[in-house]
Amino acid sequence: EQEILSKNPDQMVVVCCGKGNNGGDGFAIARHLANRNYRVTVVHAGEAKTEDAFKNQQIWEQFGESVSFPSSDASRIINSADILVDSIFGTGLERGIGGAYHEWIEIINDCKAASKWAVDIPSGVYSDDSRIRGQAVRCDFTVSMQFGKTGCFQFPGSSLSGIIFVSDISIPFHADCLKNPDNENHLGTWLSTPSFIKKLLPRRPLESHKGDFGHLFTVCGSSGMAGAAMLASM
């Protein structure tokens, strides 16, 4: 919500909500945006299936406009959006996208919204390994909760995630739900960024010579495959 507010003042927002907790987040986002005088409409998949999502859906329907998908109204509303928020599926997706959901995502991808935002991860991208489950939303921005999701940083999922923001929702690092079963002291996944790599490289005096830091001997492939050896030796 804060990321959308900072970039898109005074525009029409359409929030597409599924039946699970990701959809519940979408209803909450719609409510907060409406409270800040955005014009917001929710397109939803029907009655929410989880307790938290159902509560947020009930709150929204007391004062906000919503339509269910599939319907001609839903398609029209999606195509009228300036900003579209994808909150259909999140990290819990375990099946392929088919039927009405496949059609829904196609309409979202074809609409001419100025910007499309994913909540946590684009719908249809598998969070652990970035596979596409039949169909997936192409987003300009993704706002991941607390930690970036692996599926947003690997292909093909990364090509659909756009610019990625990570939003702190105050989950402590040592929480049980975040522990790696093989090593509870860390999460088990590291994202290579320029700042991360820079920390691994020792600071070298300006007057130093390459010979001051040892020698490297590389054993590589056949004589016709020298490219990798050259790159590794640079």
Predicted feature locations:
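Structural motif
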Residues: 76-77, 134, 156, 208
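Internal gly/pro-rich beta-alpha loop/helix module
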Residues: 82-83, 88-90, 94-186
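Nucleotide and nucleotide-moiety/phosphate-recognizing core
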Residues: 1-88, 96-119
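Small-residue (G/A/S/T)-rich helix-start motifs and N-terminal tracts that mark the onset
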Residues: 1-45, 152-234
